[in-house]
């Protein structure tokens, strides 16, 4: 049960997502001991975990094919238990965001609503859901700055390179996931990006996003005076694995190869976090 709950909450993904709030605050020179900042971190974790739990509730049919070892398909966690967890996370997100002010509270409520909409409808909207997830992920840099300083646009603008870089990277990885999940999504009649456009066309889009990420790192990072180790680490540890993924995603690529690429990109994501911490 405990292991199943840990997997349901996707701690390896939801905790790093909450750390993006801290990272954004650091990039804006905010004091990391600020209580409001940690409320924003907790709210982001609850929102992200809520998204994963409701995703598993919505995807049970296809997960029996694509991810049969997940807690709901295996029966380790029941649908009823998962719904209770989702309600608790929803409540936690709102309770943590409420002390930060009306605007942060409404933004948290909007994020929860968008994640629910994604899991119920947008995931089948051939790219719309992927854009939403990438946007929400990239936006995770901002709440910490707002929690500490309010809407100080000069500080928020300093996050532009990091936000753009994360958006391109997450969108590329999200599109690759649609290739991984073709079998299950096709079986339940979903119209994901890979099913609508084909795996090779998806590869070309990922290639384009790789170029955009490369351009962001080369042009914007030095322009915004991010430290040079950040640029070097991003190129070697993030852009290069993404380029390798594009190279590997041939028509003959097996499911295991696609999953290896996804694992590589997950590692690249953490390298990117370290790189930005050095910025």
Residue ranges and their predicted role:
Residues 28-40, 133-182, 186, 199-211:
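Functional transmembrane core segments of multi-pass inner-membrane proteins
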Residues 42-43, 60-108, 190-226:
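Multi-pass membrane catalytic core of lipid/isoprenoid biosynthesis enzymes
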Residues 21-28, 93-101, 115-119, 140-148, ...:
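Structural signal for membrane-spanning alpha-helices in multi-pass inner-membrane proteins
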Residues 2-7, 73-153:
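Intramembrane alpha-helical segments
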Residues 17-24, 73-74, 131-148, 194-199, ...:
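Small-residue-rich segments of transmembrane alpha-helices in multi-pass membrane proteins
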Residues 56, 61, 113-126, 174, ...:
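C-terminal ends of transmembrane helices
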Residues 3, 14, 222-279:
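Extended hydrophobic alpha-helices typical of membrane-associated regions
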Residues 17-58, 90-98, 102-116, 154-176:
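Membrane-embedded alpha-helical segments that form the functional core of polytopic membrane enzymes
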